[in-house]
Amino acid sequence: QRAGGPGAYRDAEVLAAMRAAARLKLPLNLVSILPATENMPGGRAMKPGDVVTTLSGKTVEVQNTDAEGRLILSDGLAYAGRYKPAVLIDIATLTGACVVALGQFAIGMFGTDETLKESVRKAGVRAGERVWEMPLWDEYFEQLKSDVADMRNIGGRGGGMITAALFLSKFAGDWPWVHLDIASTDWSERERAYIPKGPTGIGTRLLIQYLIDRTL
């Protein structure tokens, strides 16, 4: 999960889903990882052109300091691998490109495992939080190649949501993995029958439904 900026109060889906799973007493072994840091300027802050070494050992050339969410998520994904998870799901208000591509009504989904993706898709339909799968093709990684590190933290102008997901995929290991980009859906400009105007909590219902489905 990644949250940031003045609207960070709207980003607590993983925490909410874990709380619900505990209250429902779901017979599952769950691990929730919430990488957190304070994003602010300072004498030791990241600068464009810096090269950082991630928890996984991979190096990243920082091309844009505003693409910081994927940096902390990369360490969260690498850390999650220590638990040898049956499945790995991350959720983040990650990219403005998601807003442009999908608008307010679809969660962007990427993944490496067909069974997991289909389970998440079905859970989204049941929960009223629909996902739309986007490609995770290797050709897009050309935009992330770096001369001084294993990869850059941002690509070019095109396909920003895809290159962000591809970046994360390099830290997800070989575990069945799904990434949900909720940047376009975490806020509603109007009241709906099931959501008040404002923060939507999008992804919480989907995650809970997915967890319930795993117990059936």
Residue ranges and their predicted role:
Residues 1-216:
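A generic structural signal for tightly packed, nonpolar segments enriched in small/aliphatic residues
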